[in-house]
Amino acid sequence: MEVEEEVSRWEGYADWRNRAAVKGRHGGMLAASFVLVVEILENLAYLANASNLVLYLREYMHMSPSKSANDVTNFMGTAFLLALLGGFLSDAFFSTFQIFLISASIEFLGLIILTIQARTPSLMPPSCDSPTCEEVSGSKAAMLFVGLYLVALGVGGIKGSLASHGAEQFDESTPKGRKQRSTFFNYFVFCLACGALVAVTFVVWLEDNKGWEWGFGVSTIAIFVSILIFLSGSRFYRNKIPCGSPLTTILKVLLAASVKCCSSGSSSNAVASMSVSPSNHCVSKGKKEVESQGELEKPRQEEALPPRAQLTNSLKVLNGAADEKPVHRLLECTVQQVEDVKIVLKMLPIFACTIMLNCCLAQLSTFSVQQAASMNTKIGSLKIPPASLPIFPVVFIMILAPIYDHLIIPFARKATKTETGVTHLQRIGVGLVLSILAMAVAALVEIKRKGVAKDSGLLDSKETLPVTFLWIALQYLFLGSADLFTLAGLLEYFFTEAPSSMRSLATSLSWASLAMGYYLSSVIVSIVNSITGSSGNTPWLRGKSINRYKLDYFYWLMCVLSAANFLHYLFWAMRYKYRSTGSRS
């Protein structure tokens, strides 16, 4: 009887009370559905402010267009980069369940600070209608940035844990579980879009018509409700027990390999037969932790032996780390640890190739919003706030995600006779191609917008240009589609390909790519202004009015860089070999 009860338990997983997770009671689509609802509210809370933040900084904090754009990209970049911290802590010391609760509480605190500042005139710079206004400074600026970066810290932790927490609910040892997990990632992006839809319509309307205290207030309520909903699903979750620092494993293998290369000893005495998978160590560790709680009275009588790991020929320079006689016992590495580090290193070029796409996405939150603000934003008698422009890609994602999951993927599975239908890397590649097209469209639209401004004699005027903002929607549609293909593909790619002890950290690379894209955008803007502003010339992206910017040149540059990046991606993608079940084409 005890053996049957043991078999029904999820190895390496515990419930929220640190008791053994039980099959049929914990995990599955029901548990993951709580995560999907939470993602709607979490992204609503974040994007409601991020999408419109450039206008808040410019009009209420009186920052220049270029400074406000850079501050927004730095804020969003920091938020996504901190996902690495959330992913690391989820793998090493805490569960994804715990990291979400801690991070959501931090974001909640940051939003409270921003709400208080927005509703208190004495905490903001004086209102001003002239072209030159007093920029926020001193304690007021400190309060602004403390609030913003507390939000960034909270968002980072959530991004680094929530998607992994949902994906952990599925049994990857069965085809059904893997298909459900793939569906989860598609609908995770769908729910992200649902939250964005409310954010860029209702909340942005509140910010523009009722005041920013209303916008921050709604975000505060949304993140608070998300915590309550997440907690309500606690009894259904299976929580992966942390296995120790994945960075320690990576650094140990790299250091051991370096020492071996520098020594005169041969690496031929590495033995595979003595090594076992870190994930199995993790399971053993998890079982000991649960047993210490008195939940597991006896270990399994007949434990299946893990498959023996074998050194592969790829990245052979690391094979020396699996030496049976290391220089120091602290540098002792198993063969499986060496192979796990190889997997992570092989994924890094794919990760790097997605940064440029996210650099293009950064333009949606900065220059594109400012372009739309100069155009006619009326549709009939309805006036659309410029920050609501993302509604176009958001709605497209909400339409395309179910079609992709229920029509395209089943057809692709039948056509290719594979479990995935479309491989993760193929999906990412489609997104990269769409980003190239988006930048070309953006350049053509900007040529038209500036032509209207010149013909109307409004190059230096703040008056609305007689051209509809729907032209800007074209680039949003292309970039929105690119985001759907790339983000969902990246999340699933990193989760399925990464070693089980490093999955949260690996999945957070999807968000770190976004972060580096935003930072790269700031760097490119600075470099472009520095080069084009030399010899007394006017920089491309600086001037009294955005109508004087050479944004069309900038977008063409982004198009060329994106095309070069795609060729770089093809080089690595065509040489990549999948390791996980269900990922092979």
From Swiss-Prot:
Positions in coiled-coil regions: none
Transmembrane segments: 28-48, 75-95, 96-116, 142-162, 184-204, 211-231, 343-363, 391-411, 428-448, 465-485, 508-528, 554-574
Record's keyword annotation contains RNA-binding: no
Primary location: membrane
Deleted gene: phenotype: Reduced effect of ABA on seed germination and postgermination growth and increased number of open stomata.
Tissue-by-tissue expression: Expressed in root hairs and in epidermis of both root tips and mature regions of roots. Detected in shoots, stems, flowers, siliques and imbibed seeds. Expressed in vascular tissues in cotyledons, trus leaves, hypocotyls, roots and inflorescence stems.
A cellular-component GO term for this protein: plasma membrane
Domain of life: Eukaryota
Subcellular location: Cell membrane
Positions of disulphide bridges: none
Recorded family membership: Belongs to the major facilitator superfamily. Proton-dependent oligopeptide transporter (POT/PTR) (TC 2.A.17) family.
PANTHER family in alphabetical order: OLIGOPEPTIDE TRANSPORTER-RELATED (PTHR11654)
Stated name of the protein: Protein NRT1/ PTR FAMILY 4.6
Encoding gene (name): NPF4.6
